[in-house]
């Protein structure tokens, strides 16, 4: 018998099923926004029913989602809330637009309203963050802006009050409703994959660096976590395959539509897409063929005619169609455009055959605007019949095509073009009448010129048959070298051609290798830019982690306020004497150097934000690893990282330099402005707290006094929170220190709990000592005089 499924698992499964249904509805909304409004009017009853269901779901789930936001968010709950909000808002807007269209009948006005063409860009959200060091203003425009802001908020969590963080996170959530809540597909204007995310950084930290710095590797990183690529496969015969099975059509209509579709596909299928010879080359070949046809064996063969025959031989035997590098990487953008035209023609033909009208979808209603876009925008928008991978291949082939259009590379990659040029030059000389009447074997004035033209056109650039015959011709009788000035000139010209060929061959190899390396490096960016992107789980997970950290602080203060016994030292009389006594007792001692590594890790644990929690994983890492991820992801300057790393070691617990706070002014930032100075002041306060508690444990021998964070506790399956005894740093300047000296056996705060509030390190330690004194072996030390 299978084990029963736990209640949280069942709830998660239900939320996943609900999430899938809401995503389907959002996808329908996105389709109807771009579809002919006449079709949308026919779907009004179903659309209204879905809108009513979304209203009911939102009304029923919203209280629970809001309660969970104050308790513990999950990426699933965040995504579901964003989708519900977007589905409710955009579904109502679509219904209103369809009803307006039913009255006005203006297709352009319908698309202007549904697509937001008359409204400002919705992806600009101003965010204000109030910190102890001042107010920070930012603007969110991309998905990576959201991730960067959340990482920055995570780093500055110790100087940010929970109220200010909650207000800023609410503005971030509003941006994510339109950005992430719009379904699976990411709008191209929202994605900027050149900015690496925290997952990119973590992946690079665990892979071989090949001697490169992390900054250099991040600069070349294409993020595929905030948005992920989706493989899109398009079937060219999809309409032909599924039309026979379309529901709601009569057999006669279906047969007529299939007949029209076949006729339209046959008419638009013309053209093979292969390159055709230019008219100029065609006329040259015709002229050469006419001269050769007029010659027979009874006539003397002139050197020019022999050169024409040899060039025609190389042209006939050198057909490299579909084999050369040029053909392998030729641009195929026209073929993609032809495919789009064929798809559009077939769709319109079927629409006319079935419905008697051409549907006015968004791309057709605004076709003139889309046609005015440049090539880059058109590629980003894409098409209905071409997949992004087809566009990428066409772009890469276009790059090679453009690179190979230089005269040198064109002659090397396409030797037949050299033969065409040589044939044209020979015909030009013969047209001048210089060599047409000279007998074969004679020493006419164009003999050397024709031979050189043939060699340049065939063997000069590496065609078969070159090399050996040339070498023999250069030498005189007996192979002893040239004997006349003509032989010297011929040999010099041949040497120049050979050096030119070798240099061009080497240049071509380097050029093509460099181009190939560039294409390989840029292909990832092209794929990320042009392929369809879907939302990843990074943003919901990051938002949930940061929001949970600040919600835990507010929840901790609310729960401790309801404890059975609450001692508030912030306004109690006689606290100053306790402060002075404990301060004097601790300043006489210094921290054991052997404890410095452990208290340094404690410092890192308290400074680190709630986002990077590697120290709590199943395979836990030390706190310095999580802090490393935190500071590196915000680009902290090297001198600040060095200062942070040596903050505890620099003090060492000796002298009184570590005690920086005045009485009842612990975690007070009055008179301090700026993020970095405020951060440094918070580091000093945290160092003071750590050293004071360490000395307190060693002086009074009461065991280790635990320093904890409010977000150390997670809810149980019953929704309860356990807070073990210890001193908690709340990061709240009004009440920065809370000591739980007694709690219920299960660790929950209740009537038996004893809680101490304070704004002073030494007075709260004295209160802890008072509660620990009856349990100490020697009964504790004397109190303040």
From Swiss-Prot:
Entry's Gene Ontology BP terms: viral DNA genome packaging
Pfam family, one: PRTP
UniProt region (Disordered), positions on chain: 433-489
GO molecular function, one term: ATP binding
Annotated ATP binding sites: 696-703
Main localisation: host cell
C3H1-type zinc finger span: 197-225
Keywords: ATP-binding, Host nucleus, Late protein, Metal-binding, Nucleotide-binding, Viral genome packaging, Viral release from host cell, Zinc, Zinc-finger
GO cellular component, one term: host cell nucleus
Subcellular location: Host nucleus
UniProt cross-references to InterPro entries, sorted A to Z: UL28/UL56
Similarity comment text for this entry: Belongs to the herpesviridae TRM1 protein family.
Role according to the record: Component of the molecular motor that translocates viral genomic DNA in empty capsid during DNA packaging. Forms a tripartite terminase complex together with TRM2 and TRM3 in the host cytoplasm. Once the complex reaches the host nucleus, it interacts with the capsid portal vertex. This portal forms a ring in which genomic DNA is translocated into the capsid. TRM1 carries an endonuclease activity that plays an important role for the cleavage of concatemeric viral DNA into unit length genomes.
Quaternary structure and partners: Associates with TRM2 and TRM3 to form the tripartite terminase complex. Interacts with portal protein.
Name of the protein in its database record: Tripartite terminase subunit 1
